[in-house]
Protein backbone atom coordinates (compact mmCIF):
# COMPACT_ATOMS: atom_id res chain seq x y z
CA UNK A 1 0.00 0.00 0.00
CA UNK A 2 1.32 3.46 -0.87
CA UNK A 3 1.16 6.22 1.74
CA UNK A 4 2.45 9.77 2.01
CA UNK A 5 4.36 10.43 5.23
CA UNK A 6 3.24 13.43 7.27
CA UNK A 7 6.35 13.38 9.46
CA UNK A 8 9.85 11.93 9.45
CA UNK A 9 9.84 8.26 10.43
CA UNK A 10 13.09 6.49 11.17
CA UNK A 11 13.94 3.66 8.75
CA UNK A 12 10.99 4.58 6.53
CA UNK A 13 11.30 8.07 5.08
CA UNK A 14 10.94 11.80 5.46
CA UNK A 15 7.94 14.11 5.59
CA UNK A 16 6.09 14.34 2.27
CA UNK A 17 7.74 11.23 0.83
CA UNK A 18 5.68 8.58 -0.99
CA UNK A 19 6.52 5.12 0.40
CA UNK A 20 5.22 1.57 0.01
CA UNK A 21 4.36 -0.20 3.24
CA UNK A 22 2.48 -3.33 4.24
CA UNK A 23 -1.29 -2.70 4.32
CA UNK A 24 -1.54 -3.78 7.96
CA UNK A 25 1.24 -1.41 9.02
CA UNK A 26 -0.58 1.44 7.29
CA UNK A 27 -4.06 0.58 8.61
CA UNK A 28 -3.07 -0.28 12.17
CA UNK A 29 -0.22 2.13 12.88
CA UNK A 30 0.54 4.91 10.41
CA UNK A 31 -2.98 6.03 9.51
CA UNK A 32 -4.57 5.97 13.02
CA UNK A 33 -1.64 7.93 14.47
CA UNK A 34 -1.88 10.41 11.57
CA UNK A 35 1.75 9.78 10.68
CA UNK A 36 0.75 9.15 7.07
CA UNK A 37 -2.16 9.50 4.68
CA UNK A 38 -3.30 7.24 1.86
CA UNK A 39 -1.65 8.16 -1.44
CA UNK A 40 -4.72 9.45 -3.29
CA UNK A 41 -4.45 12.24 -5.85
CA UNK A 42 -6.23 14.70 -3.53
CA UNK A 43 -3.89 13.88 -0.64
CA UNK A 44 -0.86 14.28 -2.90
CA UNK A 45 -1.99 17.81 -3.78
CA UNK A 46 -2.65 18.68 -0.13
CA UNK A 47 0.74 17.35 0.98
CA UNK A 48 2.47 19.24 -1.84
CA UNK A 49 0.77 22.48 -0.76
CA UNK A 50 1.83 21.87 2.85
CA UNK A 51 5.38 21.17 1.70
CA UNK A 52 5.47 24.43 -0.28
CA UNK A 53 4.12 26.40 2.70
CA UNK A 54 6.68 24.76 5.00
CA UNK A 55 9.47 25.59 2.53
CA UNK A 56 8.38 29.25 2.33
CA UNK A 57 8.28 29.47 6.13
CA UNK A 58 11.74 27.90 6.46
CA UNK A 59 13.15 30.28 3.84
CA UNK A 60 11.71 33.29 5.67
CA UNK A 61 13.08 32.17 9.04
CA UNK A 62 16.50 31.49 7.54
CA UNK A 63 16.55 34.93 5.89
CA UNK A 64 15.72 36.61 9.19
CA UNK A 65 18.45 34.58 10.93
CA UNK A 66 21.01 35.60 8.28
CA UNK A 67 20.13 39.28 8.73
CA UNK A 68 20.48 38.94 12.50
CA UNK A 69 23.82 37.15 12.03
CA UNK A 70 25.16 40.09 9.98
CA UNK A 71 24.12 42.49 12.73
CA UNK A 72 25.39 40.33 15.60
CA UNK A 73 28.77 39.37 14.14
CA UNK A 74 31.27 41.50 15.99
CA UNK A 75 29.01 42.28 18.95
CA UNK A 76 30.96 42.54 22.18
CA UNK A 77 29.46 41.56 25.53
CA UNK A 78 31.17 42.58 28.76
CA UNK A 79 30.49 40.51 31.87
CA UNK A 80 31.95 41.36 35.27
CA UNK A 81 32.58 38.58 37.78
CA UNK A 82 34.39 38.26 41.07
CA UNK A 83 37.78 36.64 40.58
CA UNK A 84 40.74 35.51 42.64
CA UNK A 85 44.42 36.44 42.40
CA UNK A 86 45.25 34.12 39.49
CA UNK A 87 42.35 35.26 37.25
CA UNK A 88 40.19 32.29 38.25
CA UNK A 89 36.52 33.20 38.63
CA UNK A 90 34.54 32.52 41.77
CA UNK A 91 31.86 30.61 39.89
CA UNK A 92 31.61 30.69 36.10
CA UNK A 93 30.04 32.46 33.12
CA UNK A 94 27.37 30.29 31.51
CA UNK A 95 25.32 30.58 28.34
CA UNK A 96 22.49 32.01 30.47
CA UNK A 97 24.76 34.84 31.66
CA UNK A 98 25.73 35.60 28.06
CA UNK A 99 22.08 35.48 26.94
CA UNK A 100 21.14 37.91 29.75
CA UNK A 101 23.93 40.28 28.69
CA UNK A 102 22.75 40.08 25.07
CA UNK A 103 19.18 40.80 26.18
CA UNK A 104 20.47 43.92 27.96
CA UNK A 105 21.82 45.00 24.54
CA UNK A 106 18.40 44.31 22.90
CA UNK A 107 19.35 40.98 21.30
CA UNK A 108 16.77 38.41 22.40
CA UNK A 109 18.71 35.19 21.97
CA UNK A 110 17.74 31.90 23.59
CA UNK A 111 20.54 30.59 25.80
CA UNK A 112 20.40 27.22 24.00
CA UNK A 113 21.58 28.91 20.80
CA UNK A 114 24.82 30.02 22.42
CA UNK A 115 27.40 27.33 21.60
CA UNK A 116 29.39 27.27 24.82
CA UNK A 117 31.17 23.93 25.23
CA UNK A 118 31.76 24.48 28.93
CA UNK A 119 31.27 27.43 31.28
CA UNK A 120 33.97 30.12 31.22
CA UNK A 121 36.02 30.00 34.43
CA UNK A 122 38.80 32.51 33.76
CA UNK A 123 39.07 36.21 32.98
CA UNK A 124 39.73 37.19 29.39
CA UNK A 125 38.27 37.61 25.92
CA UNK A 126 36.46 34.73 24.23
CA UNK A 127 34.96 34.24 20.77
CA UNK A 128 31.62 32.45 21.18
CA UNK A 129 29.53 31.12 18.27
CA UNK A 130 25.77 31.70 18.37
CA UNK A 131 23.75 29.29 16.21
CA UNK A 132 20.80 31.34 15.02
CA UNK A 133 19.50 28.69 12.62
CA UNK A 134 20.55 25.28 11.30
CA UNK A 135 23.54 26.58 9.34
CA UNK A 136 23.54 30.28 10.29
CA UNK A 137 26.14 31.13 12.92
CA UNK A 138 27.19 34.53 14.28
CA UNK A 139 30.34 34.96 16.35
CA UNK A 140 30.26 37.30 19.32
CA UNK A 141 33.04 38.41 21.63
CA UNK A 142 32.58 37.91 25.36
CA UNK A 143 34.90 39.85 27.65
CA UNK A 144 34.99 38.54 31.20
CA UNK A 145 36.38 41.26 33.46
CA UNK A 146 37.17 41.38 37.16
CA UNK A 147 34.42 42.93 39.26
CA UNK A 148 35.73 45.83 41.31
Curated annotation (Swiss-Prot):
GO biological process, one term: translation
InterPro entries reported in the protein's UniProt record: Ribosomal_bL9, Ribosomal_bL9/RNase_H1_N, Ribosomal_bL9_bac/chp, Ribosomal_bL9_C, Ribosomal_bL9_C_sf, Ribosomal_bL9_N, Ribosomal_bL9_N_sf
Domain of life: Bacteria
Record's signal peptide: none
GO molecular function annotations of the record: rRNA binding; structural constituent of ribosome
GO cellular component, one term: ribonucleoprotein complex
The family this protein is said to belong to: Belongs to the bacterial ribosomal protein bL9 family.
Stated role: Binds to the 23S rRNA.
Protein name as annotated: Large ribosomal subunit protein bL9
Amino acid sequence: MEVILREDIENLGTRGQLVKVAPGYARNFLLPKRMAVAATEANRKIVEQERQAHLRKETKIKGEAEELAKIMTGVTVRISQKAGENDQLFGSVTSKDIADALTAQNYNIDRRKIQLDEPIKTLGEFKIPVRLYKDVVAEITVIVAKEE
